[in-house]
Amino acid sequence: MDQGNTAFILLAAALVLLMTPGLAFFYGGLVKAKSVISMMMMSFGAIGLIGVLWAIYGYAIAFPGAEGTIAPWSIDTGALFLNNLLETPDGAAFPPLAFVAFQATFAIITVALVSGAIADRAKFGAWMVFAGVWATVVYFPVASWVFNFGLADDGSFAYGGWLTHGLQDVFGTGVIDFAGGTAVHINAGAAALALALVLGKRVGFAKGISVPHNPPFVLLGAGLLWFGWFGFNAGSELAADGTAALAFVNTIAAPAAALLGWLVVEKIKDGKPTSVGAASGAVAGLVAITPACGSLHPLWAIVLGLIAGAVCALAIDLKFKLGFDDSLDVVGIHLVGGLIGTLYLGFLANGTGLFFSGSWSQLLVQAIAAISVLIYSFVLAFVIGFVIEKTIGFRVKNEDEIAGIDQVVHGEEGYVLADAKA
């Protein structure tokens, strides 16, 4: 067992877990002051619920081993409650539980991302029901499609879901998704779009009506997300080696370029570059580089960042043109950014991209993976959300939304600056 790599993976897991509190600040600053508690609680609720489900059965579904190389849904019953993962096989590079912890943080942040689409108007209890069901029937299986890493009987490292191993058998190459452009960002973005349609628009929804109540929170959240993203991307190599270093550098270069690209578009479009734009641009670049961070030259990572920042800055206005209320631009940043990064690899992935190999295979595989995850997640998220809305109710009453969801749902206010009563 390599103690250095084990420490690297555990540190990466801690960094990725920090991303969810970072997301809470990012989302919390973007909403109205009377919704900040509700918004942040949806992220922290995801930590609690998904952390438990992952240990009980989530890992067993997401990483079913050899049986999951082709099947779209399978389960390793021996991994339920992590029962067969407590011992480290001879020759293994690191303890299985280190990998379990690392991937748990991916499941948590993916679910939390979806919540941004339903800000200001969702019941906390209904959100928790959705989070648990969606994670079970969507995230856990989709993670197996893309990742399904595992330790073989001889302790060697093997992987392959149907989007990797299965498509490779057909096209000669599997999907390249280094850290989750499909399984995390396209997946969450598609679910966010579905929930935005199910819950409908906020009261008074219109461009310019709802402005972020706390831009410093947004910047703080973006900074924590960026910091944690080094664990997300570099940690996905599962070894402290040259590929991890490449992923680390690209996690600096792409979001930095995206930040600039977003600000340029914002200046041209709206007349002023904003702090929220800078934060959103950085996140858009982080999303786009996620699938590509280990497979791109840094120069092409910068180009990807510029494209993602500029396109996502334009994409966030689609909700006003198309009439859906994606409150915090999960669709415009995560779905669009994830699609850009995933498809970009079809052209410029080292060795297999169209511009390097002359073959369309990688681009075709990337498109199949992106579309498959998008459709699967959207359809099931819509069905789950619709059933919740028609049974226990997903959306608060309009008068409660106007009064302030924090008080109605949680009995708290985000900014009570007064001495506590004795």
What is each stretch, according to the model?
Residues 1-422:
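Glycine- and aromatic-enriched membrane alpha-helices
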